[in-house]
Amino acid sequence: MDEGKKSSALDHALRLLAGRAHGRAELESKLKKKGFDSESIAKALARLDELNLTDDRAFAQSCTASMARRKPEGRLKTRARLKQKGLPDNIIDEALNGCDQTELCRSAAEKKLRTLPASPDQKKKKLITFLKNRGFDWETIRETVKLVLGEESARSDQLD
């Protein structure tokens, strides 16, 4: 492949990185989809490594924090999303160890609670289903539901 194509792979990777952070595997995949050959991709990724523009650990931390702010999800869902981005298991584990699953679950539950019907039984059932679908484990869900419904009950008792 000619020199123009090699720099083109690097240029394309730099444009991708200008938009948002990417993991190494994600960049490689996008460059392959764009039609660059393996040699051009390898050279472009090597150059990005030299420039310290690819850091899977920082990328995993950034993704995890962003997902937690935008849409709090449990460990299982977050792991699956990071895996889709091509991150290795050890880096995913490091990123997830920095997350407080109880706090994420509570945040999601409190936000959802405002939209649920008034019936306490329906509220509890829908909240459990919602949190389960968000990928939280049963123990965290159980503790969180007990806590947020207890707080809500205490607040409504104070108003009476």
Swiss-Prot record:
It is found in: Cytoplasm. Keywords: Cytoplasm. GO terms for biological process: regulation of DNA repair. GO terms for cellular component: cytoplasm. Its main location: cytoplasm. Pfam families: RecX_HTH1, RecX_HTH2, RecX_HTH3. Belongs to the RecX family. Modulates RecA activity. NCBIfam families: PRK00117.5-3. This is Regulatory protein RecX. It comes from Chlorobaculum tepidum (strain ATCC 49652 / DSM 12025 / NBRC 103806 / TLS). The lineage of its organism: Bacteria, Pseudomonadati, Chlorobiota, Chlorobiia, Chlorobiales. The gene is recX.
